[in-house]
Amino acid sequence: NPNFLETFAGIASSFKIPDKILEFELTESIFFDNQQIKTVRETIQEMHRMGFLCSLDDFGSGFSSLGLLKEFDVDTLKLDRSFFLNMSGQKAKDVISCLIDLSRHLKVKTVAEGIESMEQVELLGSMGCDMIQGYVFSAPIPVNEFEKRYLRDQP
């Protein structure tokens, strides 16, 4: 839908949602041909102009290219869970640490996806990872369960 940004901008305006609160996630698999790259670059620019954030989701899950990071002005790099399946070796830790450092140099926030243990949380924290998500905190839950658990004291 070519008007999807206008639709979301209208919703954000009607609910008085401040800029830089809503974030769109793009998966790296959409960046496979040159015409798409041009369209995606322009769409990301339009997202930012309208006050939205943009993240590159599942980075490293397929045929990711570091070139994507120079092509697109994303706000967040979401590192795919495959990076964290076996973090016991030094080489694995070095790759993760380098990606986090690269993101920091590019002024892009990092999210580690699919984290399952407090040991991973502590290691990623020591590496400077900005955000962590995964089963270590909660399995996916239905909306009504979320509301019961987290919004019970709301008016």
For every predicted segment, state its role.
Residues 7-14, 39-50, 98:
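Catalytic-core regions built around general acid/base machinery
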Residues 2, 14, 21-35, 52-155:
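EAL-family c-di-GMP phosphodiesterase catalytic domain
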